[in-house]
């Protein structure tokens, strides 16, 4: 995947695909029949049982995520299409929730908090709009905050917050995302 030419939804789906558990099974024994000429350690897909990446000791962490995303896109195109559609809905839901940030329930509104360690930064806490109990935390610089009272931020900060929220929403079911749209 050439990440330079991906849509925001494709980028979000790729990041999420890197963490999908069923595509990241580790084969550590060379006698495993799935290897078929490849050597362990290797990654195999729990859905199709294909061994799709040999791992070297120095690249295990970086290869696992990238290879899993590539495998899902190549070997499971129907799932990939659904993942892109889900990412698109999550981005849309995140934008809608961000636009409604001043009119939603008070406990689901983003809040600003003083950063105790770095005085030149302010922490923003963004609760999950699905109300799952997760609160996303990020730090903003003073120049990214345009108005604290109405939660107005620079375009860069807004895009970052929306992307972070969409990344979290990817973990929720489609029906939960549909309720936000």
Predicted regions and their residues:
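Short intrinsically disordered terminal tails
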Residues: 1-9, 175-181
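Intrinsically disordered, low-complexity linkers and flanking regions associated
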Residues: 7-32, 85-112
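Short recognition patches in nucleic-acid-associated and regulatory proteins
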Residues: 28-30, 51-59, 133-156
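Short, flexible, mixed-charge glycine/proline-rich loop motifs
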Residues: 29-40, 113-123
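Disulfide-bonded cysteine motifs in exported proteins
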Residues: 40-43, 123, 127, 156
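Short cysteine-rich clusters marking metal-coordination/redox-active sites
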Residues: 45-48, 128-130
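C-terminal recognition-helix end and immediately following basic linker
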Residues: 59-84, 145-178
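Extended non-catalytic scaffold regions that mediate assembly and binding
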Residues: 112-113, 126, 145
């Amino acid at each position: 995947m050439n990440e330079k030419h991906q849509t925001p939804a494709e980028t979000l789906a790729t990041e999420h695909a890197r963490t999908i558990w069923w595509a990241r099974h580790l084969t550590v024994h060379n006698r495993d029949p799935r290897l078929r000429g490849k050597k362990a350690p290797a990654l195999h897909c729990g859905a199709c049982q294909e061994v799709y990446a040999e791992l070297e000791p120095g690249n295990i962490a970086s290869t696992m995520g990238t290879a899993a995303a590539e495998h899902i896109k190549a070997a499971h195109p129907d799932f990939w299409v659904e993942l892109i559609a889900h990412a698109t809905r999550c981005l849309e839901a995140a934008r809608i929730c961000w636009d409604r940030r001043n009119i939603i329930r008070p406990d689901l509104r983003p809040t600003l908090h003083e950063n105790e360690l770095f005085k030149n930064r302010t922490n923003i806490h963004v609760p999950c709009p699905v109300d799952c109990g997760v609160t996303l935390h990020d730090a903003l610089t003073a120049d990214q905050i345009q108005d604290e009272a109405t939660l107005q931020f620079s375009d860069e900060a807004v895009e970052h917050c929306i992307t972070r929220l969409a990344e979290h929403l990817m973990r929720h079911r489609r029906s939960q995302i549909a309720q936000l749209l």
